Regions:
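Condensing-enzyme catalytic core mediating Claisen C-C bond formation in acyl metabolism
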Residues: 2-221, 328-393, 446-448, 495-509
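Conserved catalytic cysteine-centered active-site region
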Residues: 199-218, 258-298, 302-309, 421-464
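Short, well-ordered amphipathic alpha-helical segments that serve as non-catalytic structural scaffolds
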Residues: 222-239, 268, 298, 373-391, ...
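Conserved beta-ketoacyl condensing-enzyme motif
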Residues: 223-282, 286-287, 392-423
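Short acidic, glycine/serine/threonine-rich loops at helix termini
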Residues: 259-262, 294-298, 322-328, 410-413, ...
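A glycine- and small-aliphatic-rich helix-loop capping segment at beta-alpha/alpha-beta transitions
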Residues: 262-277, 301-305, 327-335, 416-420, ...
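Short beta-strand segments
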Residues: 311-317, 481-486
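Glycine-rich beta-alpha junction loops
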Residues: 317-318, 362-368, 400-407, 487-488
Length: 509
């Protein structure tokens, strides 16, 4: 027995099995451990049938049901989505700079179509619906019994789906039961394929709780399922046993909770459970689009301090952003490109002598008092961290910033977001007298990259390039890369401030 404290004649003790006296999966040697990026994996699910449930489409379709036919006719096939060059770049099939060699529009190019890529997979919508049911712990997902039989046979061949998963998939429901449930007021949200076939529904979890309605539950289950697949892929790729993960940080945009705690959170633990990480605990980090960079810095600090040997950072999808720009895509008679859900998982561990190091001595942060101008933000995130290391702007091989695919954003008037950021970084380099004004285009081409990420908010912020950077640094083709993200905190109406954070990874010497 371990003595906790003593008062008078009575001694209060805790059993040795109490969590205060156990240090399983925690370091007892707190000597500083240099953190490295041991692995990075991505996951995409092609979900054209879910586009109607994105925030913008769901509102517009409610106001104008006649839009449905036009929207449906502009949804892509799985073959087109898997051949789409930005999707292939996101999954490591091509290097982002290769996009510069291909004329736009990229959606008009008919190239190689592959589900499996070096950094992850693009899953068809049928299988993702099955995954939603596997992630469901409260019988919220009702799938048609015929559809369930078909998808079970397909998922049985997936290398990351287990027998236990198939058991959780269950037998499904008769289609008549699903129709009856959806006919009830607020009873269920339909789950449909691209072709319009209804294969199930999401039911509400509470009759009165507005945070447990079908649309919110669908959003949260999609985030959980996508993040879990990214983490499973990461564990497999790095040959890491699930029980060897002691801590998981989730940095998705979901808000899991109930009416008394609308964002109560800790989806991290649910994701860990779905991946068999029985010795893990975890927590969620929220910072709008800047969340993943904050989470990576925290994970690196936990490893560096010796608290944990390794930490997994996960970020699930943002279903609300499906079809966010669909009206401008319809106006331009182009495919609805926001038809994929994206997730990522990153493993940060102790220095192994090979993996790229994350430099904790050069973290950039946008402080409360820094000001909200773009120049002030870039100064905090780029100039000051470089100054601390005695580096020039050109000493960074690649800058990864907001990597939104311009083919998605430009038709709606949002411009080429990555290009604007790279021009700002180049302008700061001119102010530092490192390059001339005339050299800005060359600097942008050499140290920037075209946007290629799905517009999934936090997912698009810098992290999509991490897998490419790790590959190139380990191959000796790159020395260092900087990752910077910004967050629009003012959208939540609690502050007028923006946010930002950055870090540098470099070759392990």
């Amino acid at each position: 027995m371990a003595t906790l404290f003593k008062a008078g004649p009575d001694t209060f003790e805790l059993p040795k099995t109490h969590c205060y006296t156990r240090f399983t999966n925690m370091q007892t040697d707190t000597a500083l451990k240099a953190p490295v990026i041991r692995g990075v994996r991505y996951f995409l699910a092609h979900t054209p049938g879910l586009v109607q449930h994105g925030s913008k489409p769901s509102r517009d379709l409610l106001a104008d049901p006649g839009l449905a036919a036009d929207l449906t006719s502009h949804l892509r096939s799985f073959t087109d989505a898997s051949a789409y060059l930005p999707n292939r770049a996101f999954l490591g099939g091509i290097y982002p700079d290769d996009l510069l060699k291909t004329a736009r529009p990229w959606h008009g190019q008919k190239g190689e179509s592959s589900r499996w890529n070096p950094h992850g997979e693009l899953m068809p919508e049928e299988e993702f619906y099955g995954l939603l049911k596997i992630a469901d712990a409260f019988d919220l997902v009702w799938l048609d019994e015929d559809f369930t039989n078909d998808v079970a046979a397909t998922l049985a061949g997936h290398p990351l789906v287990s027998e236990d998963d198939l058991e959780r998939l269950g037998q499904g429901h008769p289609h008549s039961e699903i129709e009856e449930r959806m006919a009830e007021t607020g009873g269920g949200l339909p789950l449909q394929l691209r072709c319009g076939r209804t294969i199930g529904c999401i039911v509400r979890a509470h009759d009165e709780d507005a945070t447990l309605t079908p649309d919110v539950l669908l959003e949260n289950l999609a985030c959980k399922a996508s993040a879990a697949m990214a983490l499973r892929s990461l564990l497999s790729e790095t040959s890491t046993a699930p029980e060897d993960i002691p801590y998981v940080i989730n940095c998705g945009e979901e808000a899991v909770g109930e009416r008394y705690q609308r964002g109560g959170g800790n989806l991290a633990k649910g994701i860990a459970e779905m991946c068999g990480c029985t010795e893990a605990t975890g927590s969620d980090v929220k910072a709008f689009c800047c969340g993943p960079v904050h989470a990576m810095v925290m994970a690196a600090a936990l490893v560096n301090s010796g608290v944990y040997q390794q930490v997994a950072v996960v970020a699930g999808c943002s279903l609300a952003k499906l079809g966010m720009k669909f009206r401008s895509h319809l106006d331009n008679d182009q495919p609805v490109l926001e038809d994929v859900l994206a997730a990522t998982a990153i493993l940060i561990g102790e220095d192994d002598g090979v993996s790229p190091r994350l430099r904790l001595d050069s973290i950039g942060k946008h402080t409360v008092g820094a000001g909200s101008s773009q120049q002030a933000i870039i100064k905090c995130l780029v100039s000051e961290p470089l100054d601390r290391l005695g580096l020039r702007f050109q000493d960074v091989d690649k800058y990864a910033t907001e990597l939104h695919n311009p083919e998605v954003t430009e038709p709606g008037g949002s411009g080429d977001v990555p290009l604007l950021n790279y021009r700002m970084i180049a302008a700061m380099a001119t102010m530092a007298k490192e390059i001339e004004q005339a050299d800005i285009p060359q600097f942008v081409e050499e140290h920037g990259m075209p946007g290629f990420s799905p517009t999934q908010g936090h997912i698009a912020s810098a992290i999509p390039f991490l897998g490419h950077a790790v590959d190139r640094i380990k191959a000796g083709e790159m020395e260092r890369a900087m990752f910077l993200a910004k967050g629009s905190l003012f959208l939540g109406r609690m502050t007028q401030l923006s946010d930002g954070m950055s870090f540098i990874i470099e070759k392990n010497h």
